[in-house]
Amino acid sequence: MASSAQSGGSSGGPAVPTVQRGIVKMVLSGCAIIVRGQPRGGPPPERQINLSNIRAGNLARRAAATQPDAKDTPDEPWAFPAREFLRKKLIGKEVCFTIENKTPQGREYGMIYLGKDTNGENIAESLVAEGLATRREGMRANNPEQNRLSECEEQAKAAKKGMWSEGNGSHTIRDLKYTIENPRHFVDSHHQKPVNAIIEHVRDGSVVRALLLPDYYLVTVMLSGIKCPTFRREADGSETPEPFAAEAKFFTESRLLQRDVQIILESCHNQNILGTILHPNGNITELLLKEGFARCVDWSIAVYTRGAEKLRAAERFAKERRLRIWRDYVAPTANLDQKDKQFVAKVMQVLNADAIVVKLNSGDYKTIHLSSIRPPRLEGENTQDKNKKLRPLYDIPYMFEAREFLRKKLIGKKVNVTVDYIRPASPATETVPAFSERTCATVTIGGINIAEALVSKGLATVIRYRQDDDQRSSHYDELLAAEARAIKNGKGLHSKKEVPIHRVADISGDTQKAKQFLPFLQRAGRSEAVVEYVFSGSRLKLYLPKETCLITFLLAGIECPRGARNLPGLVQEGEPFSEEATLFTKELVLQREVEVEVESMDKAGNFIGWLHIDGANLSVLLVEHALSKVHFTAERSSYYKSLLSAEEAAKQKKEKVWAHYEEQPVEEVMPVLEEKERSASYKPVFVTEITDDLHFYVQDVETGTQLEKLMENMRNDIASHPPVEGSYAPRRGEFCIAKFVDGEWYRARVEKVESPAKIHVFYIDYGNREVLPSTRLGTLPPAFSTRVLPAQATEYAFAFIQVPQDDDARTDAVDSVVRDIQNTQCLLNVEHLSAGCPHVTLQFADSKGDVGLGLVKEGLVMVEVRKEKQFQKVITEYLNAQESAKSARLNLWRYGDFRADDADEFGYSR
């Protein structure tokens, strides 16, 4: 600490006190401060200076934890204003001081002046003049300092300043609150708005004690997202600093101690508050990282409201320069070329919930594991039935939901893959199986990180790493933030609700069960299915959602090359092109949603029939690509002509199974393909029902009279032969008659049987649904079945629009459509087909106005941008309408364009 000696007169005269200088580090009270020197290679020395000749009130003191009978001591009147007067005047400022007295206990008393010499402001006199301190009695009257203090005190009394004002000063006593009953509620109540505060103590570089204003809460605040070296407490009570702990503490002290700051309270951890301290001169969290005094910590970085990437960037800055705690840091070496690190690939298969199989541009297949996430796991495995074979996809809670989320988002689509790290192969241990080498990557589609989307829905968790482990996702902080949101919102794995149970019956190879299912599948016509596995080109395993069962399915009408088989004692080689046929089927249908028509079954309990994908018959496609031949059993099928035509075309190409086919060449006339144009052929329909997801059901106006006649005849028949109440036993998928609320009977289909009192039915001619007791149902007379007149309600969806994900916004759109078109005649044109239902444009019958375009104009829906050339004109019109709605801030757009930041994929909702 700097000092300068001032000489007096002769050696016999009184000694002149030595003037010393320092920087005020802390104000202990209205009459005591701590000064420090300039730092040189480490934290500087400090000393406490007590002001001579004056007395200020004592500040509040908390009772010692070791003395259970002791009580907290409150502020004395005017003690805190005196402390604040000095704090605002002196903290961080240079002062000079003289020591007049030193007690045997080492306490030093003296005079303090603001500035570099004693000509500056006398701090003791300023305190007394403001009425914040009193002159000590008993001093020599002829002492010049004492005389000046006496004058200052008289002036303060005359002006009624401070303690000399009217009243007892009780309003200056703080109501200090040392504890908070519910820290989590306290943090949430501030809604991450900055709170004014004073930093009262610095425990280490990243932990402080702060006084929150204006309510005087004294709280411990840990800086979100970082951790500085700490002071280890030894058994004898002493503290041992970790490397750079003292330097980090001084770095924070010199910038924040007893400064006015604002704190954003961000979260709560073990009764400690996590927050970010804001100061006009900068963000201490980022500064500590940048100077190499702190490291990022994963467990709290997700709550940092100013963006975790800023903290990672600051840490990288210090690592690259090997500053302080990073002096021995060695950067990981890159072992991948750029082309292998980033690439675009097509997703061919989803493996459970954390890995996918992609097809590279080279045609090779590669398994990619999603970085830093863990799929749902089975808890309490010891309680499981050891005799029961575990089926992870269905038996592990939320595994099926996670797989389905990935399947629906990714299968058949191109994704961007960024390899984050390669996990080396590991041998098996007693508790952990062996793992082969794994390529772990961040996979995005449409700018959305699939792992983050999965975590945000509570369908996966984030792996926790050692702090020095850099082998992690390049978007690790976003994953942590997504998990925090999922936990807060109780999504998926973090939900308090009962876990979903999937009772899926596997009837593959079970002849008895297959016989029971066969009639239902035959009557159902086309059934929805998901291809779970491809055994060969014509043999597949299907999951039927409505029936919740797994079946083995054989393609009808074709003879596909048989693949290699393992037989007892030998391996039977596969027929030529069997592998190509299997690969073709895999690439086309594996994990896709398809439609199947079951015709029969074989002796082994395998179902035989036709499989359709995107309107195409897989049997025909295999024949068309010369990977199968037509089987004679196809003669009885309605697809026989298509199969023969495809086979003839394949024969002419002489490829694959027809490579050695010999026939007289036939002149082939190739049709001239014309560029497809948008077809606008509007037909009159009657809108009968609008669903909550903005689909709608219509009746064809041209067949309306047939329905009216059928309904009239059916009701007359029922009136003549009424069903016996309670005699009908409903089964899912069956057609029946149901009595609607108007007391009339209508044709319906049973969708679900909860109990005899709760039967879910769908009115096939009108599109509405209802839950009825079985007493209001009856058998559908054969004379009025769907073979006589097919179901008249057809489901459609609006083309070129996206339905809002937000429940309230979607309700607004549905309400608008209900008001405009329900129970009215409109004009309908099919624009394109989809796996769910055809997408159409709908016009008002009188004005010919486009209903979907009207929704866009009102800002109730968004535009679905399609790439097909024939739709560009109408898409442009829709986009122009959307821009107009945006400009007018209508409905969805009332807060501007929300789509970039408010993606539902990440768990947000408006």
Swiss-Prot record:
KW Acetylation (keyword) present: yes
GO molecular function, one term: endonuclease activity, active with either ribo- or deoxyribonucleic acids and producing 3'-phosphomonoesters
Pfam family, one: SNase
Assigned GO CC terms: cytosol; melanosome; nucleus; RNAi effector complex
Broad class of the protein's primary localization: cytoplasm
Modified residue annotations for Phosphoserine: S426, S645, S785, S909
Top EC class, one word: hydrolase
InterPro entries xrefs: Silence_cplx_Nase-comp_TudorSN, SNase_OB-fold_sf, Staphylococal_nuclease_OB-fold, Thermonucl_AS, Tudor, Tudor_TDRD11
EC numbers on record: 3.1.31.1
Crosslink site: Glycyl lysine isopeptide (Lys-Gly) (interchain with G-Cter in SUMO2): K513
PTM per Swiss-Prot/TrEMBL: Phosphorylated by PIM1 in vitro.
N6-acetyllysine: residues carrying this PTM: K193, K641
The Tudor domain, residue ranges: 729-787
Assembly with partners or alone: Forms a ternary complex with STAT6 and POLR2A. Associates with the RNA-induced silencing complex (RISC). Interacts with the RISC components AGO2, FMR1 and TNRC6A. Interacts with GTF2E1 and GTF2E2. Interacts with PIM1. Interacts with STAT5. Interacts with SYT11 (via C2 2 domain); the interaction with SYT11 is direct.
Function according to Swiss-Prot or TrEMBL: Endonuclease that mediates miRNA decay of both protein-free and AGO2-loaded miRNAs. As part of its function in miRNA decay, regulates mRNAs involved in G1-to-S phase transition. Functions as a bridging factor between STAT6 and the basal transcription factor. Plays a role in PIM1 regulation of MYB activity. Functions as a transcriptional coactivator for STAT5.
Protein name stated in the entry: Staphylococcal nuclease domain-containing protein 1
Organism encoding this protein: Pongo abelii
Gene for this chain: SND1
